[in-house]
Amino acid sequence: MEKPNTKQVLLFYCVEAEELARKVAAQSPLITLQSINWRSFDDGFPNLFINNAQDIRGQHVAFLAAFSSPAVIFEQLSVIYALPRLFVASFTLVLPFFPTGSFERMEEEGDVATAFTMARILSNIPVSRGGPTSVVIYDIHALQERFYFSDNVLPLFETGIPLLKQRLDQLPDADKIVVAFPDDGAWKRFHKQLDHFPMVVCAKVREGDKRIVRLKEGNPAGCHVVIVDDLVQSGGTLIECQKVLAAHGATKVSAYVTHAVFPKNSFERFTHKDDGSDKAFTYFWITDSCPRTVKSIANKAPFEVLSLAGSIADALQI
C-alpha cells in the first residue's frame, strides 16, 4: 500500500546550492526553504547563524550541501552537525556529489583513501530526536563505498539514470540508441538500469607506455551511441572513447555523466566552436550535482542539464 507523501520539510542549503534548492522547493508545496547567514570572521573562519532556530523544533529538517572544494566543507559541516541538535523531528543531508569517491582504495602502503575519511566524518553527524541522519548521495563512484558509513547514519544511494532514460525517449532517433560504457567498472555499475538498450563496452589497454581505449564488445555501426559514466574530470577517456566509436561507424556520439566535475574548465574541450570544426559530441548531458560547473557551462552546446530537483524532492519524503 502506498504511503501518501505528507511530510512537511524545512530545507536549508549552502550558498552554492541555492539555485538547486529553489528548484527542489518548486517541486512540492511540502518543502519550504529556510536560510542561514553565511559570514566569515576577519581571519577567514566561518561566522554562521541558523535563522529561526527555535521555530524548527519538532520539524523535519534537511540540508542541501555542495562539497565543491575543501575550503567550503568545514563551514557546511559546522551547520550539518548543528541542525540535528536543534530538537528537530528528523534530519536529512542531501549531498548530490560525494567528492572524494574516486579515491576509495589503497594501492600501496601510505595511500590515504579519502573516500573513507569523508564517510567517517559524515557518519559522526549527531542523531536527531527522530533517530539517525539520512544521507542522500547520487551515483557514488564505487558501490562498495556504502560500507564505509557506520550504523550511526542511514545512507540512501540514488541515481540520475532515470533522468537520462527520460531524455533518450524524447530523441527523434530513440530507436537507434546504443549505450556505451568507457570501461568494465561503468558497465558493472549501470548496465542493469539500461538493459533494454543495445550495449557497447570499451576497455583501456596498455600499449608500451600508453593506455589506449579499445572496443571490447558490441557494434556501434549506424547508431547514435551514448557513453554513460558516473563522473567526468578532464574528459580524456570520453574523448578517446568517442574516437573509437566513430571509427567503428557510429553516426552520432553523445555522453551522459551524473557529476560534471571538470576541474580547471576542462569542459571547454567539449564545447561546440563556431569555426565549423568537427563537433565530436552531439549532446553532453550532465546533472546539477556540481553547481559551479552548471553556472560555467550555461547555454554552451553540446551541454544539457538534467535537474535532480524532482528526484531530491521525492527523496526528502522517504
UniProtKB/Swiss-Prot annotation:
Q: Where in the cell is it found?
A: Cytoplasm
> Is Transcription regulation set as a keyword in this record?
no
Q: Which Pfam families match?
A: Pribosyltran, Pribosyltran_N
Q: Where does Mg(2+) bind?
A: D139, H141
Question: What is the reaction catalyzed?
Answer: D-ribose 5-phosphate + ATP = 5-phospho-alpha-D-ribose 1-diphosphate + AMP + H(+)
Q: Give the domain of life.
A: Eukaryota
Q: Which residues form a coiled coil?
A: none
Q: According to the UniProt entry, what is the EC number of this protein? A: 2.7.6.1
Q: Which UniProt keywords apply?
A: ATP-binding, Cytoplasm, Kinase, Magnesium, Metal-binding, Nucleotide biosynthesis, Nucleotide-binding, Transferase
Do you know which SMART domains this protein is assigned to? Answer: Pribosyltran_N
Per the UniProt entry, what is one GO biological process?
A: purine nucleotide biosynthetic process
Residue ranges of region Binding of phosphoribosylpyrophosphate?
Answer: 222-237
Cross-referenced SUPFAM superfamilies: PRTase-like
Report the family membership: Belongs to the ribose-phosphate pyrophosphokinase family.
This one is known as Ribose-phosphate pyrophosphokinase 4
Q: Give the species this sequence originates from.
A: Spinacia oleracea (Spinach)
Lineage of the source organism? Eukaryota, Viridiplantae, Streptophyta, Embryophyta, Tracheophyta
